[in-house]
From Swiss-Prot:
Keywords: ATP-binding, Glycoprotein, Kinase, Membrane, Nucleotide-binding, Phosphoprotein, Receptor, Repeat, Signal, Transferase, Transmembrane, Transmembrane helix, Tyrosine-protein kinase
Transmembrane annotation, as ranges: 550-570
Gene expressing this chain: Epha6
EC number: 2.7.10.1
Signal peptide: 1-22
Reaction(s) catalysed (UniProt annotation): L-tyrosyl-[protein] + ATP = O-phospho-L-tyrosyl-[protein] + ADP + H(+)
Family label: Belongs to the protein kinase superfamily. Tyr protein kinase family. Ephrin receptor subfamily.
Name listed for the protein in its UniProt record: Ephrin type-A receptor 6
Limits of the SAM domain: 960-1024
Biological process terms in GO annotation: axon guidance; ephrin receptor signaling pathway
GO MF annotations, alphabetized: ATP binding; transmembrane-ephrin receptor activity
Length: 1035
């Protein structure tokens, strides 16, 4: 008991005067200590045993509060060979494993006592012995175990006695482990003058506590001071575990290292370490340590601990509305309905309702009724009318009605609805308008017939309408594939009642509709007619007929040629005819050899390798630039073929534009020159805002003013616009230092892209863009690839590093000059003159079978999407190329990057279909991204591409249905992780379908192979669940 004072101290045998001081005996207890013995609190006699009897003396005095003060004293310093023992009563150890003994005592300085230098001591010894029961009066000192020799930090003298100064010493010793039920303590004196004022025996515990809303019970620490006891807490009332709450009990009785926590359940909030129910008028919808919230408008609650507020009468909350959203009500009726009618179309327009009910999801429905003279005699209009775009779920305030009948009273009821209209039992408010039709349009075409069919064509005819109501201007024929009725259609016109439709697919059924146009307008479309194109056998029969015609024509032509030949021989003009014919044939052969076959309206890619001289290919597709128009400013990069500079290009009549310039170094090989010019001849064929633009080339004239002999051909890939190397000094005339000799460089001049390659640009600006901005970048890349695909060009190295970004964030596809050599060794990498093509971007069929196509470019585009959404992260991270190939073969696909909307990741998965024919076309991708940009809310909706995925349930891959998550894990040989999934709360397939690779690592799946197998199965499960839900991904 620190800080206590002795009330009375009496030294025996007359050597000292009594020392009287006040001692209250009121000592505070520490919360982490459990006291087994405290002599200062014992009210009766201690009854400790002494040996011999004339050794230790017990002295008891009463303090001012009438409480006893027990002391034991000994001072036999005059006689040698002292051996005085004092033993406590039996002490129960309770739950202790280690005990602590605190002793308060005073000790006389031997130097202050005359004539006792040989016999006086200044220490005493502490002993103990364990026992399961009391020994009574039996006492055998030899059986006791020594704990320690106790010495005083301060000893008193005769002067201290005179000045009434008490020097009290406190010493603590620990004993353990204690294994029996109890123990004795013993004090041995061998000749000291000492007074044992108090003895306190205790053990330490980590006391009951509440941390992070979790309760932890009293805990006894281990004997080993370096070992901690892990204790799991239990959540306080009205709370639940978020992460398992844990504390560690230290050897000193202190709680250490808090882990995990509990959170208040729904309807409860945390106040001063406990969970209290929300007051009436307040709610809390989700478990967590947030405060209760006031009920939103038009809702209330009158009880405590409410998780959701109830809507007032007439107000509702939709199923998907969050609890924090105000209750809303159905809208009022639309206003100001008006119509506009012509011969063939009726347009209905209206104003929004005056009261939207507090919601933004307003839609309209139009109900049509045909009424007679009596307004009460109405019937439904049926399927005869067509509504554009549709009669229900309208977002805009108008609709077009077609195919109505003349001289009929139509009543249109326009209803306004929102997300809670279906919850109300009240009739839906509407506004009605009645329209009487009177049209002069032609009647419908009644019949269409097929005259003949080939593999790619159909010849159709029909009869003119019975009532045209004027001169027929033309016919419009609309047609589409029967299987793709809802996707797209084509149309053509004919002035005659017949038409030949070309460009069709063989053995395919098409649907045709036809309508008439007169001066009064269009008629309605006819009913649908089905016709099928022919197959190869039908064309063979047609070809046989054509052969007969050709053979007949050939015989006639040969006869005519003989007659003409005789005629020219007779007239003497045969020689002129033969020369002219030879000249014409030679010109035609030369034209064919150069592969310059052009078709009107169609631009196709021409491989520069078909030209003997690469310079011919370059000048076929790109213009020569006068070197005097080029001003070089600085070197911005270096590569295999030379250096890349930035500069300015002067254009007559226009201002200077920034450009990037690269040349071929002097002393180059013919192969290097061919590869260098090949890139320019490829770029020169492209003209698209999302393709890097070639300004021109320099191949014919020397350029001594520049004096540059080396430029890098890989500048379109290596982020050159960011300045890879420190700029070289440039003279005022625009040339580099004279140490570089003048020469005759081959130069390629392209537009300057300020922000460099896309991957490094995104890494530099990580997290700076909105999702819509990133989608805009992806849309630009897809548009450029669509252009290349339409031209028949396969890129084969599409990656973010090969996309360049200008100052307006426009992305442009680059890197067209790399030659791609596929070695015979099946283990060979796909090499180029610029290095290896990374496996991570390459489609599996291109890796396995060397099959590059637009579909393999689509696979690479999916990887580019992942790079963009992850801000330039490396695909497949640190996996080796071999692991990447094996993972893809096993069905593994990259997970969604952080913050990536579900619809974009789903598009990536479509691009990574193993069957290349199932991947979307770039046309589909551009269309889909356009819709996302127009409707950003669709970014967070899971979609399925019906052009990519199987079109009927029978085409869906077989996937077993599992009853439990454990069954699913067993099926993929991962049953050892059942407890991990259960403990983490992933107990339903809906939750599992949303798991990411981070979730799988977090629950304890460490092995990469196991992670890969589980992720692969989750992706298959997710696609299967999407088919079950029958969601559409329309492009």
């Amino acid at each position: 008991m620190g800080g206590c004072e002795v009330r009375e101290f009496l030294l025996q045998f007359g050597f000292f005067l009594p020392l009287l001081t006040a001692w209250t005996g009121d000592c505070s207890h520490v919360s982490n200590q459990v006291v087994l013995l405290d002599t200062s609190t014992v009210m009766g006699e201690l009854g400790w045993k002494t040996y011999p009897l004339n050794g230790w003396d017990a002295i008891t005095e009463m303090d001012e509060h009438n409480r006893p003060i027990h002391t034991y004293q000994v001072c036999n310093v005059m006689e040698p060979n002292q051996n005085n023992w004092l033993r406590t009563n039996w002490i129960s150890r309770d739950a202790a494993q280690k005990i602590y003994v605190e002793m308060k005592f005073t000790l006389r300085d031997c130097n202050s006592i005359p004539w006792v230098l040989g016999t006086c001591k200044e220490t005493f010894t502490l002993y103990y012995i364990e026992s399961d029961e009391s020994h009574g009066t039996k006492f055998k000192p030899s059986q006791y175990i020594k704990i320690d020799t106790i010495a005083a930090d301060e000893s008193f003298t005769q002067m201290d006695l005179g000045d009434r100064i008490l020097k009290l010493n406190t010493e603590v010793r620990e004993v353990g482990p204690i294994e029996r039920k109890g123990f004795y303590l013993a004090f041995q004196d061998i000749g000291a003058c000492i007074a044992l004022v108090s003895v306190r025996v205790f053990y330490k515990k980590c006391p009951f506590t509440v941390r992070n809303l979790a309760m932890f019970p009293d805990t006894i620490p281990r004997v080993d001071s370096s070992s901690l006891v892990e204790v799991r807490g239990s959540c306080v009332k009205s709370s639940e575990e978020r992460d398992t709450p844990k504390l560690y009990c230290g050897a000193d009785g202190d709680w250490l290292v808090p882990l995990g926590r509990c959170i208040c359940t729904t309807g409860y909030e945390e106040i001063e370490g406990s969970c209290h129910a929300c007051r009436p008028g307040f709610y809390k919808a989700f478990a967590g340590n947030t405060k209760c919230s006031k009920c939103p408008p038009h809702s209330s609650t009158f009880v405590e601990a409410t998780s959701v507020c109830h809507c007032e009468k007439g107000y509702f909350r939709a199923e998907k509305d969050p609890p924090s959203m105000a209750c809303t009500r159905p809208p009022s009726a639309p206003r100001n309905v008006a119509f506009n009618i012509n011969e063939t179309a009726l347009i209905l327009e209206w104003s929004p309702p005056s009261d939207t009910g507090g919601r933004k999801d307003l839609t309209y429905s139009v109900i049509c009724k045909k009424c007679g003279v009596d307004a009460s005699q109405c019937e439904d209009c049926g399927a005869g009318l067509r509504f554009i775009p549709r009669p229900t779920g309208l977002i805009n305030n108008s609709v077009v009605v077609l195919d109505f009948v003349s001289h009929v009273n139509y009543t249109f009821e326009i209803e306004a609805m929102n997300g809670v209209s279906e919850l109300s039992i009240s009739p839906k408010p509407f506004t009605a308008i009645t329209v009487t039709t009177d049209q002069d349009a032609p009647s419908l075409i009644g019949m269409m017939r097929k005259d003949w069919a080939s593999q790619n064509s159909l010849a159709l005819s029909w009869q003119a309408p019975a009532f045209s109501n004027g001169a027929i201007l033309d016919y419009e024929i609309k047609y589409y594939e029967k299987e793709h009725e809802q996707l797209t259609y084509s149309s053509t016109r004919s002035k005659a009642p017949s038409v030949i439709i070309t460009g069709l697919k063989p053995a395919t059924t098409y649907i045709f509709h036809i309508r008439v146009r007169t001066a009064t307008g269009y008629s309605g479309y006819s009913q649908k007619f089905e016709f099928e194109t022919g197959d190869e056998t039908s064309d063979m029969a047609a070809e046989q007929g054509q052969i007969l015609v050709i053979a007949t024509a050939a015989v006639g032509g040969f006869t005519l040629l003989v007659i003409l030949t005789l005629f020219f021989l007779i007239t003497g003009r045969c020689q002129w005819y033969i020369k002219a014919k030879m000249k014409s044939e030679e010109k035609r052969r030369t034209h064919l050899q150069n592969s310059h076959l052009r078709f009107p309206g169609i631009k196709t890619y021409i491989d520069p390798d078909t030209y003997e001289d690469p310079s011919l290919a370059v000048h076929e597709f790109e213009k020569e630039i006068d070197p005097s128009r080029i001003r070089i400013e600085r070197v911005i990069g270096a590569g295999e073929f030379g250096e890349v500079c930035s500069g300015r290009l002067k254009t007559p009549g226009k201002r200077e534009i920034p450009v990037a310039i690269k040349t071929l170094k002097g002393g180059h090989m013919d192969r290097q020159r061919r590869d260098f010019l090949r890139e320019a001849s490829i770029m020169g064929q492209f003209d698209h805002p999302n393709i890097i633009r070639l300004e021109g080339v320099v191949t014919k004239r020397s350029f001594p003013a520049i004096g540059v002999e080396a430029f890098c051909p890989s500048f379109l890939r290596a982020g050159f616009l960011n300045g890879i190397q420190a700029p070289h000094p440039v003279t005022a005339g625009g040339s580099l230092p004279p140490r570089i000799p003048a020469g005759r460089p081959v130069m390629i001049v392209v537009e300057y892209m300020e922000n460099g390659s896309l991957d490094s640009f995104l890494r530099k600006h990580d997290g700076h863009f909105t999702v819509i901005q990133l989608v805009g970048m992806l849309r630009g890349i897809a548009s450029g690839m669509k252009y290349l695909s339409d031209m028949g060009y396969v890129h084969r190295d599409l990656a973010a590093r090969n996309i360049l970004v200008n100052s307006n964030l426009v992305c442009k596809v680059s890197d067209f000059g790399l030659s791609r050599v596929l070695e015979d060794d099946p283990e060979a990498a796909y090499t180029t003159t610029g290095g290896k093509i990374p496996i991570r971007w390459t489609a599996p069929e291109a890796i396995a079978y060397r099959k590059f196509s637009s579909a393999s470019d689509v696979w690479s585009y999916g990887i580019v999407m992942w790079e963009v959404m992850s801000y330039g992260e490396r695909p497949y991270w640190e996996m080796s190329n071999q692991d990447v190939i094996l993972s893809i073969e096993e069905g593994y696909r990259l997970p969604a990057p952080m913050g990536c909307p579900p619809s974009l990741h789903q598009l990536m998965l479509h691009c990574w279909q193993k069957e290349r024919n199932h991947r979307p076309k770039f046309t589909d991708i551009v269309s889909f991204l356009d819709k996302l940009i127009r409707n950003p809310s669709a970014l967070h909706t899971l979609v399925e591409d019906i052009l990519v995925m199987p079109e009927s349930p029978g085409d869906v891959p077989e996937y077993p249905l599992f009853v439990t998550v454990g069954d699913w894990l067993d099926s993929i040989k991962m049953g050892q992780y059942k407890s991990n999934f259960m403990a983490a709360g992933f107990t339903t397939f809906d939750l599992i379908s949303r798991m990411s690779i981070e979730d799988i690592r977090r629950i304890g799946v460490i092995l990469i192979g196991h992670q890969r197998r589980i992720v692969s199965s989750i992706q298959t499960l997710r696609l299967h669940m999407m088919h079950i839900q029958e969601k559409g991904f329309h492009v």
